[in-house]
């Protein structure tokens, strides 16, 4: 079952991206390097509730 998750920047706390993930294959929190428009660079984004 795929669910929508929000990704938040670890440095600014901005919630910049929405993506989907499969909870059965990825039960832990999702982490991705994504572009942060406020910092104008790539930063680590983590899944939020």
From Swiss-Prot:
Keywords from the named record: Ribonucleoprotein, Ribosomal protein
PANTHER family: 50S RIBOSOMAL PROTEIN L33, CHLOROPLASTIC, LARGE RIBOSOMAL SUBUNIT PROTEIN BL33C
Coiled coil stretches, renumbered: none
Gene: rpmG2
UniProt-listed Gene3D superfamilies: Ribosomal protein L33 (2.20.28.120)
Any GO BP annotation: translation
InterPro entries, A to Z: Ribosomal_bL33, Ribosomal_bL33_CS, Ribosomal_bL33_sf, Ribosomal_zn-bd
Organism classification: Bacteria, Bacillati, Bacillota, Bacilli, Bacillales
Protein name (database record): Large ribosomal subunit protein bL33B
Keyword Flavoprotein included in the entry's annotation: no
GO MF annotation terms: structural constituent of ribosome
GO cellular component: cytoplasm; ribonucleoprotein complex; ribosome
Source species, domain of life: Bacteria
Keyword field contains Ribosomal protein: yes
Family statement: Belongs to the bacterial ribosomal protein bL33 family.
């Amino acid at each position: 079952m795929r669910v929508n998750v929000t990704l938040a920047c670890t440095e600014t706390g901005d919630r910049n991206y929405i993506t989907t993930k499969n909870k059965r294959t990825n039960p832990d929190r999702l982490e991705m390097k994504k572009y942060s428009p406020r910092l104008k660079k790539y930063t680590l984004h983590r899944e939020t509730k």
